[in-house]
């Protein structure tokens, strides 16, 4: 899967779950499960409930995503 195939969406973190997983509500109203991307994990970026995030979704599984950006 190339980078062109991913779907980028905005959302809000609802809940922090174990193993760096998060419950995220997208702007469309859908709730998904998301994990932190490698760059955010390497730079120790903290993600807390209420944060606005950008999520990449795979076209194969729209219920899971990767958090690629935390808005300030």
From Swiss-Prot:
User: Which cell locations does it reside in?
Assistant: Cytoplasm
Keyword Cytoplasm in the entry? The reply is yes
Q: Which residues form the S1-like domain?
A: 1-72
Instruction: List keywords of the entry alphabetically.
Output: Cytoplasm, Initiation factor, Protein biosynthesis, RNA-binding, rRNA-binding
List cellular component terms (GO).
Answer: cytosol
Q: Under the GO molecular function aspect, what terms does this record hold?
A: ribosome binding; rRNA binding; translation initiation factor activity
Per the UniProt record, one Pfam family is eIF-1a
Which InterPro entries does the UniProt record give? NA-bd_OB-fold, RNA-binding_domain_S1_IF1, TIF_IF1
| Complex formation | Component of the 30S ribosomal translation pre-initiation complex which assembles on the 30S ribosome in the order IF-2 and IF-3, IF-1 and N-formylmethionyl-tRNA(fMet); mRNA recruitment can occur at any time during PIC assembly.
Family of the protein in this entry? Belongs to the IF-1 family.
Q: What does this protein do?
A: One of the essential components for the initiation of protein synthesis. Stabilizes the binding of IF-2 and IF-3 on the 30S subunit to which N-formylmethionyl-tRNA(fMet) subsequently binds. Helps modulate mRNA selection, yielding the 30S pre-initiation complex (PIC). Upon addition of the 50S ribosomal subunit IF-1, IF-2 and IF-3 are released leaving the mature 70S translation initiation complex.
PANTHER family with a match to the protein in the record: TRANSLATION INITIATION FACTOR IF-1, CHLOROPLASTIC
Q: What is this protein called?
A: Translation initiation factor IF-1
């Amino acid at each position: 899967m190339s980078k062109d195939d991913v779907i980028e969406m905005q959302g809000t973190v609802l809940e922090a779950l174990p193993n760096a997983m998060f419950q995220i509500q997208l702007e469309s109203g859908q709730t998904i499960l998301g994990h932190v991307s490698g760059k955010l994990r390497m730079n120790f970026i903290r993600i807390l409930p209420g944060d606005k995030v950008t999520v990449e979704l795979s076209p194969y599984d729209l219920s899971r995503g990767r958090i690629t950006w935390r808005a300030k």
